[in-house]
């Protein structure tokens, strides 16, 4: 928000930073949860788009949620904090994998999608419930056999619509679901040389959805060779 921002450093430490009118750092406080240690070098965390006081952080195969990060005062401290954190009682099925990407919904609120380091995608339908199950929505066919999920993007107008990006070279890179992960379609279109994902296509890294009007949307994909745009998602025929 306008009073403070969050940033992380390598190894997963998350810092709440207070900024002054000139955008300069006035004070800071470390806020990542006590008990969380299995962080990646660059560790995923996101703010909830509906309630910015809710924070989601991955830790290996686990998910941590802070239900009200605003209560942690900024006093230049550098210790992990216990306030309002819980670890979801469930975790991704293969604990040798780790959560590599997070995507949260606007409408309805508090749905969370998780991507992993080895092709799997999960859905949590109530992220504020510490016992909410992680539903495996990975298709039995179609996804890369061992792809790395680098981005999960949820349509802010409809939480049933979600994109998954695989950043590996030589695999099909972009999938889209309109039914909360029940089915998936390939939508990388002309960004792939072949429909299998083989060939000289770039590595896709991220996707962002920008609603324009009630009937139009802009989609942006970040790749190893630049930024691409489309306004129409049309399965294999999508033109970026």
Where are these regions (language model features)?
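Structural signature of eukaryotic scaffold interfaces centered on beta-propeller domains
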Residues: 1, 38-50, 95-107, 151-158, ...
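Conserved Ser/Thr-centered positions that define the repeating blades of beta-propeller domains
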Residues: 8, 16-21, 45, 65-68, ...
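Beta-strand initiation motifs
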Residues: 22-29, 71-79, 129-136, 182-185, ...
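Surface-exposed loop and turn segments in beta-propeller and other repeat-based domains
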Residues: 27-37, 78-95, 137-143, 189-199
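Loop/turn-rich, solvent-exposed surfaces of beta-rich toroidal or solenoidal domains
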Residues: 157-160, 165-172, 191-232
């Amino acid at each position: 928000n306008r009073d403070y921002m969050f940033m992380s450093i390598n190894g997963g430490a998350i810092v709440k930073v207070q900024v002054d009118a000139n955008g300069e750092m006035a004070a800071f406080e470390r806020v990542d949860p006590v008990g969380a240690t299995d962080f990646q070098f660059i560790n995923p965390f996101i703010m909830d788009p509906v309630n910015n006081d809710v924070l989601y952080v991955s830790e290996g195969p686990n998910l941590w949620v802070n239900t009200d990060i605003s209560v942690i005062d900024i006093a230049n401290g550098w210790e992990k904090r216990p306030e309002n954190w819980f670890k979801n009682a469930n975790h991704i099925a293969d604990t040798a994998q780790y959560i590599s990407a997070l995507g949260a919904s606007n409408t309805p609120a508090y749905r969370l999608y998780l991507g992993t380091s080895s092709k799997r995608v999960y859905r949590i339908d109530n992220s504020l419930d510490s016992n909410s199950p992680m539903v495996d929505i990975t298709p039995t066919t179609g996804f890369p056999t061992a792809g790395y999920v680098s981005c999960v993007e949820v349509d802010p107008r409809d939480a049933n619509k979600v994109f998954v990006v695989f950043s590996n070279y030589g695999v099909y890179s972009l999938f889209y679901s309109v039914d909360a992960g029940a089915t998936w379609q390939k939508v990388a279109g002309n960004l792939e040389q072949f429909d299998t994902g083989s060939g000289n296509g770039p590595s896709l890294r991220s996707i962002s959805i920008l609603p324009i009007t009630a009937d139009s949307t802009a989609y942006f994909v970040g790749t190893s060779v630049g930024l691409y745009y489309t306004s129409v998602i049309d399965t294999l025929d999508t033109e970026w």
